[in-house]
Amino acid sequence: MKRWAGFCGWAAALVLAAVPAGAAAPTYPPRAILLFVASWCAPCHGEIAGLPRLSEAAGPWRVLVVPVDRSRATAAMMAGVPVAQRWTPDAARMAAMREDLFGGTAGLPFSVAIGGDGRPCGAHRGVLSPARVTALRAGCAP
């Protein structure tokens, strides 16, 4: 039942967080891999556990962990992430990011590469591996 409630909450958040047409595209940190997570996403816990390996594969790029909800469980999960690797956009920015990045995404795990120009340049749907981090970086402008 908890799993269903989590899924319904995620789906409702996506529907309710839509940004009005014509809104400006959100800005992103350059040269970063954004790793979207939530406590109800079992593979996300594994990705966080493997964060040192993902960061090593990212080289000079940053791997930033982005919570998709504000639940206590997700906050507890984020407590295990080094402060320098947490990115918690405010609700309005997160809504704009959902509109900009999450189209066609069935759910988590989900990661997005942001190039040197601050624009999305690659996405991965599924568990992120060090090899996939390297491939995402290779597909982006420095």
Feature names for model-found ranges:
Residues 60-74, 82-92:
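Thiol-based oxidoreductase modules, predominantly thioredoxin-like and allied folds used
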Residues 91-135:
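Thiol/disulfide oxidoreductase modules built on the thioredoxin-like
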